[in-house]
């Protein structure tokens, strides 16, 4: 089953936290970038780079602190108001610097634009990963997060694919 299908199943499951607005949020990401810079051609490489860094950071957290800690990070960062300190906590300062540099290299966006965009982008992506969070049982596995972390595909491929499918799904 594809990760997008797992997300759709979680959105349809009343025991899970996801909603259709979580999918809409991902499809509308381009609107968060400053005018003229938010085309799909910039979103795809941003998600490609971010997905790889997210998958690595969350896998590392899951291995060192356990699945509940990784789930809690996803839940915490799915909330509005994520700041630079939260991103430093997730990626480490050097990881965050590398993430910004790699996005800048792939998109041509300057680092200030990227730094302003990431605190808006991370909650949208994390909200999507949190769609499989069980509403009443915090210990229940999150099939979306587990699918993201356990996939043989890179995190970047997964997020880019979900973005494309979400955009197609919402155009129907």
Regions found by a protein language model. Give the residues of each.
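A structural "flexibility-hinge" signal
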Residues: 1-172
């Amino acid at each position: 089953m594809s990760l997008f299908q797992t997300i759709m199943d979680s959105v349809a499951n009343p025991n899970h936290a996801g909603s259709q607005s979580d999918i809409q949020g991902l499809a509308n990401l381009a609107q968060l970038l400053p005018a003229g810079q938010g085309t799909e051609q910039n979103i795809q490489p941003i998600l490609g780079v971010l997905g790889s860094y997210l998958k690595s950071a969350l896998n590392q957290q899951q291995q060192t602190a356990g699945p509940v800690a990784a789930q809690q990070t996803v839940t915490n960062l799915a909330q509005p108001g994520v700041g630079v300190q939260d991103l430093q906590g997730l990626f480490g300062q050097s990881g965050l610097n590398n993430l910004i540099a790699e996005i800048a290299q792939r998109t041509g966006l300057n680092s200030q634009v990227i730094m302003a965009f990431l605190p808006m982008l991370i909650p949208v992506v994390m909200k999507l990963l949190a769609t499989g969070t069980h509403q009443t049982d915090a210990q229940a596995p999150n099939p979306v997060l587990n699918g993201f972390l356990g996939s043989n595909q890179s995190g970047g491929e997964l997020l880019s694919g979900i973005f494309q499918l979400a955009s197609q799904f919402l155009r129907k």
